[in-house]
């Protein structure tokens, strides 16, 4: 089995359905003897260019280990799911389990928002 990094972009109106989609794709990979090594939900982010007149979308990254038949079925699922705007599959040499650079930036943004919200009530008094 080979290792792959899969990134897919979901329509922003379907953001609440992302956990169900991720669960379905994880089940597809693990059900056929594969493994999910890393799963990151990057959230709603700005697109580099408009896709279908949209400027924001929901990003998800998965690092998986699977066979070619499973990968073909996964890509087929992406292609015929209208909520998935774009997808990218890259073959990697080994399993990636550490947080990606994008996930680290998401965590930094969340920490910054939390510290701002914590200091806002203190300033109001």
Curated annotation (Swiss-Prot):
Pfam families assigned: Ribosomal_S6
Q: Where is the composition biased (Basic and acidic residues)?
A: 105-115
Disulfide partners: none
**CDD domains reported for this sequence:** bS6
Question: SUPFAM superfamilies attached here?
Answer: Ribosomal protein S6
A molecular function (GO) held by this record is:
structural constituent of ribosome
Write out the GO biological process terms.
translation
Q: Which UniProt keywords apply?
A: Ribonucleoprotein, Ribosomal protein, RNA-binding, rRNA-binding
A GO cellular component term found in this entry reads: cytosolic small ribosomal subunit
Region feature Disordered, mapped onto this chain: 99-125
Check the record and name the Gene3D superfamilies matching this protein. Answer: 3.30.70.60
State where composition is biased (Polar residues): 116-125
Stored HAMAP family: Ribosomal_bS6 (MF_00360)
Q: Which family does it belong to?
A: Belongs to the bacterial ribosomal protein bS6 family.
Which NCBIfam families does the record associate with it?
A: S6 (TIGR00166)
| Described purpose of this protein according to its UniProt entry | Binds together with bS18 to 16S ribosomal RNA.
Please give the name of this protein: Small ribosomal subunit protein bS6
Origin organism is: Bordetella petrii (strain ATCC BAA-461 / DSM 12804 / CCUG 43448)
Encoding gene per record:
rpsF
């Amino acid at each position: 089995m080979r290792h792959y990094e899969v990134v897919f972009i979901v329509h922003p109106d379907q953001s609440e359905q992302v956990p169900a989609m991720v669960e379905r794709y994880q089940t597809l990979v693990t059900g056929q003897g594969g493994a999910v090594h890393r799963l990151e939900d990057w959230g709603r982010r700005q697109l580099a260019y408009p896709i279908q007149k949209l400027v924001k979308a929901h990003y998800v990254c998965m690092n998986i280990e699977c066979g070619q038949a499973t990968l073909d079925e996964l890509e087929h699922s992406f292609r015929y799911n209208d909520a998935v705007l774009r997808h990218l599959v890259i073959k990697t040499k080994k399993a990636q389990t550490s947080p990606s650079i994008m996930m680290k930036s998401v965590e930094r943004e969340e920490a910054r928002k939390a510290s701002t919200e914590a200091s806002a009530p203190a300033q109001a008094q």
